Design a protein with these regions (language model features):
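A nucleotide-sugar donor-handling region in carbohydrate enzymes
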Residues: 31-93, 97-106
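Donor nucleotide-activated moiety binding/catalytic core segment of transferases
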Residues: 2, 17, 118-121, 126-178
Length: 187
């Protein structure tokens, strides 16, 4: 029953009406799972369960996704001890990461999977595997032989990059990371 939209709010996630409030306030801090070394989660029965709070979370001001802009000491990333693998040059298929229903709604991308598949087919003839957090095959297993990972805004794209799989995003804050038109010639 929040009504004072002039106040700054802090929210964890976008469910339970919090996104409706985000749209109305002038100033907010958004908290969600981090891009790296996330807390343990499990995905089942169309729900995400947080198993522990030992990992990192992200806090973003007036957006759902951090732009990456700013100057940050490199020791912050080094302290995460992320083993970044060399780029996989022999992957055979593209993982198309289906957004959750709430993200499709928030970003007004109800046909994102089909529209993105059609766009990809203009630039590649590789097999496209649609994956979401409730898929039977784990993302870790799929990434072993993936050529690329394509997502609207999933933090799984950062995991893919760390595992040597180039990631492509269509969300405006992340689109500058890679260009889908260059999917056959990744950076």
């Amino acid at each position: 029953n929040f009504k004072d939209f002039k106040k700054t709010i802090v929210t964890y996630g976008v469910l339970r009406g919090t996104f409706d409030i985000i749209k109305k306030v002038q100033n907010y801090y958004y908290i969600d799972h981090g891009y790296f070394n996330q807390s343990g989660r499990e995905f089942k029965n169309n729900r995400t369960g947080v198993l522990n709070f030992d990992g990192y979370f992200r806090i973003v001001h007036n957006n759902l996704i951090h732009s990456g802009d700013g100057n940050f000491p490199d020791d912050r990333l080094k302290n995460l001890n992320i083993n970044i693998k060399k780029q996989n040059k022999s992957g055979s298929y593209i993982i198309l990461s289906e957004p959750s229903e709430i993200m499709k709604k928030i970003y007004n991308q109800h046909n994102w999977v089909e529209e993105t598949k059609q766009k990809l087919k203009k630039f590649t003839d590789r097999k496209i595997i649609i994956h979401n957090k409730f898929s039977n095959i784990t993302l870790d297993e799929l990434l072993k032989n993936a050529w690329a990972f394509v997502s609207l805004q999933s933090t799984a794209g950062f995991k893919a990059m760390a595992m040597g799989v180039p990631s492509y995003f269509t969300e405006k804050t992340l689109i500058k990371i890679n260009n889908i038109e260059e999917i056959e010639n990744p950076k």
